[in-house]
């Protein structure tokens, strides 16, 4: 093949994929398989000792999943990646090599409610502590870091409020403390935002959302830039010190820029078992082939709908970084020049009850707890996705009682506006009685 650098639209179709060597099939096959035959005993030993690359068992690596891993790593500009069963599993997998009981990580207050709940409660069972900080207060971010801090975590475009994190500023603070910056790029996708170019060291995805794009497959992904020095500080012994699971092998010394990726496959997936199913990887590969086309339409529709909502008398605010009036508009141009994605929130002047009435009155929008679908989705976070949070946490996450979250799809934008118009009228009519 000609030695050249391909564009994003080409890579989203071709990266990682090759014609099947056995059949010549051009589309990546679904290897619905668990185990793989060894050539001989020496081959088996080499695989188990991590001396040779290959397939052992699909909990660690599967041929279909491997194509997806290479494609997402390529699109993000990373050195390597490993897939997980869900986005929540990806968050566990990103932190697992870095943390020990008693360690902490600093996370943005502007996160998906499920992440806040996972960090606050489930991670306590591992002995991990989270410290939530508003990343707009950089002094507070610095102050939250101590000798037991092991990572800094944020979302590129926050769900649900559409807030855009100043990634360069967060990376500078993290690196000054000898810590990696982990960025959840689910809402933005690698088409809209390039976290590695702004200082991120690891990227997480819920591939369930825009990467798959059609709400057909659960999945997650952790992508490693491959440049963080895991041996420099002594803070990451799982990567820098001898591994008892592999007869004293040191992952960073042995695998260099792929240390985190190899650890993720050989230890995290092996022992926690959060692997992605081949069928789900196949569905996600199909979705990624049209990622740029879909995201352009998603963003155009979102801007049109948000602009209309901004002028509606029943609406108190619209939080969408793509609007010129947004306080994050300049940041959107810096980090997401092709568009600010299609997840945003707006507030209803009539509060919580009006929000409930609105989601029950829509006809074209689907009322459900997902995002990144080709279909337009609506939800009232305070009564659903962010219900477990305290009122204070809801407010910090831009998910207060009056807030509605939209995930704008690829339908005709005028049809979406018409549906919101009739639903808003229905919610106001009841309020006026």
Predicted segments — roles?
Residues 151, 180, 202, 317, ...:
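Structural preference for beta-strand elements that scaffold enzyme active sites
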Residues 272-275, 280-281, 286, 290, ...:
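Conserved small-domain helix->loop->beta segment predominantly found in fold-type I
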Residues 40-92, 114-122:
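Conserved N-terminal alpha-helix of the aminotransferase class I/II PLP-enzyme fold
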Residues 2, 12-14, 18-21, 81-311:
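Conserved PLP-enzyme active-site core in the AAT-like
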Residues 2-62, 70-71:
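N-terminal "arm"/small-domain region of PLP-dependent enzymes with the aminotransferase-like
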Residues 120-121, 129, 147, 294, ...:
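PLP-dependent enzyme catalytic core of the Aspartate aminotransferase-like
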Residues 77, 148, 314-317, 364, ...:
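Glycine-centered tight turns that cap/initiate beta-strands
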């Amino acid at each position: 093949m000609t030695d050249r650098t391909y564009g994003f639209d080409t890579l989203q179709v071709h990266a990682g994929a090759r014609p099947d060597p056995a059949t010549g099939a051009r589309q990546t096959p679904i290897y619905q398989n668990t185990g793989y035959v060894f050539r001989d005993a020496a081959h088996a030993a080499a695989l188990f000792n991590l001396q040779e690359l290959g397939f052992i068992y699909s909990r660690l690596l599967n041929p279909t999943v491997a194509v997806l891993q290479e494609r997402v790593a390529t699109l993000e500009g990373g050195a390597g990646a490993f897939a997980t069963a869900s986005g929540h599993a990806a968050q566990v997998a990103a932190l697992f090599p870095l943390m020990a009981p008693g360690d902490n990580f600093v996370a943005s207050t502007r996160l998906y409610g499920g992440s806040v709940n996972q960090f606050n409660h489930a991670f306590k069972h591992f002995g991990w502590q989270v410290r939530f900080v508003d990343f707009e207060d950089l002094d507070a971010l610095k102050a939250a870091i101590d000798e037991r801090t092991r990572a800094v975590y944020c979302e590129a475009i926050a769900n649900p409020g559409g807030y855009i994190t100043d990634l360069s500023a967060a990376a500078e603070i993290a690196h000054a403390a000898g810590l990696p910056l982990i960025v959840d790029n689910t809402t933005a996708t690698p088409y809209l935002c390039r976290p590695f170019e702004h200082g991120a060291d690891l990227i997480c995805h819920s591939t369930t959302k825009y990467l798959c794009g059609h709400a057909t497959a659960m999945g997650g992904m952790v992508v490693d830039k491959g440049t963080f020095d895991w041996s420099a500080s002594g803070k990451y012994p799982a990567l820098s010190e001898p591994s008892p699971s592999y007869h004293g092998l040191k992952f960073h010394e042995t695998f260099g820029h792929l240390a985190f990726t190899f650890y993720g496959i050989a230890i995290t997936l092996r022992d926690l078992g959060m692997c992605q199913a081949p069928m789900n990887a196949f569905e996600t590969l199909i979705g990624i082939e049209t990622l740029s086309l879909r995201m352009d339409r998603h963003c155009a529709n979102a801007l049109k709908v948000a602009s209309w909502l901004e002028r509606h008398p029943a609406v108190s605010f619209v939080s969408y970084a793509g609007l010129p009036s947004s306080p994050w508009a300049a940041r959107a141009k810096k980090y997401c020049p092709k568009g600010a994605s299609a997840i945003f929130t707006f507030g209803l002047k009539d509060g919580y009850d009006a929000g409930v009435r609105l989601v029950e009155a829509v006809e074209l929008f689907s009322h459900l707890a997902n995002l990144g679908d080709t279909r337009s989705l609506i939800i009232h976070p305070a009564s659903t996705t962010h219900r477990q949070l305290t009122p204070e946490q809801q407010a910090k996450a831009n998910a207060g009682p009056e807030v509605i979250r939209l995930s704008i799809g690829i339908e005709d934008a005028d049809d979406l506006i018409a549906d919101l118009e009739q639903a808003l009228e229905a919610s106001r009519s009841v309020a006026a009685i």
